[in-house]
Amino acid sequence: MPEEVQTQDQPMETFAVQTFAFQAEIAQLMSLIYESLTDPSKLDSGK
């Protein structure tokens, strides 16, 4: 049984890192969407 716990720790840690990275990407995307809705000129500037 302890071996099973050790093998599960690594995937859960990896999953947590991937989840955090995904949440950061979503936050950045939401920020860009909000910015484009509040200031449409940002879409045309190519920034």
From Swiss-Prot:
**Which Gene Ontology terms of cellular component type are present?**
cytoplasm
Alphabetized, the UniProt keywords read: ATP-binding, Chaperone, Cytoplasm, Nucleotide-binding, Stress response
Q: Which GO terms describe its molecular function?
A: ATP binding
Subcellular location(s): the record lists:
Cytoplasm
Q: How does it assemble?
A: Homodimer.
Task: Name the family.
Answer: Belongs to the heat shock protein 90 family.
Miscellaneous comment text of the record: This protein is found associated with eIF-2-alpha kinase.
Record function comment: Putative molecular chaperone that may promote the maturation, structural maintenance and proper regulation of specific target proteins.
What is the name attached to this protein's record? Heat shock protein HSP 90
Q: Which organism is it from?
A: Oryctolagus cuniculus
